[in-house]
Amino acid sequence: TAITRKDIAVEGEIQRIFYNNEYLGLVVRDEAKTGYQLHIYTSEGNENAVTEQDELHTGYAFQQRNIVMYDADYCEVQSFSGRIRFAREFGNTLYTVIPGDKFKTYYLATMEELQQIKLR
C-alpha cells in the first residue's frame, strides 16, 4: 500500500477530522462567517468538495460519497455536494452511527435499540 503525504493549507481553526481509506474530512470554523466549512480531500490530498455547514456536530463518518453527521439526538446524511439525504431528531440518546456494508444503509445505536435505516 502506497502512502501519500501532502501538505494542505487550511484557513481557519480545524474543529473536527475524520477519514477512511479513500477520503479525509476537515471541519473548519469559517472566520468570515458564523458557520463552518466541511472540506473533503482524496487520499492523495486533492480537494474533492467543500460545503458550508451551519452547525458543528459531535461525530462524522464517510460512507462512499456520503457524510454521516450526528449528535446526541440528531443524525444527518449529506452528499459530498451538500444535498441532505436524511435528517432526523431522536427522542433517545444517539450513541453512534455506523455506516452499513451496503450503500445507503446505516445503523443508529441508542440506549434502547439499534435501528437500521435504508435511504432511497
What residues fall within each predicted segment?
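Residue position within the beta-strands of beta-propeller blades
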Residues: G25-V28, M69, Y107-L108
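Hydrophobic, glycine-enriched assembly/anchoring segments
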Residues: V97-K118
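Periodically patterned hydrophobic/aromatic "hotspot" residues that form packing/interaction faces
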Residues: F62, I67-M69, V77
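Repeated scaffold domains used in trafficking and secretory/extracellular systems
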Residues: A9-E22, E52-R65, G91-K104
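Short strand-connecting beta-turns/loops that link adjacent beta-strands
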Residues: E31-A32, K102
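Acidic (E/D-rich), amphipathic helical modules within compact regulatory domains
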Residues: R5-K6, L24-L26
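Surface-exposed loop/turn elements that mediate protein-protein interactions on large endomembrane-trafficking
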Residues: T1-E11, A32-Q53, A72-G91, M111-R120
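Long, low-complexity regulatory tails in eukaryotic proteins
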Residues: G25-R29, I40, T96-V97
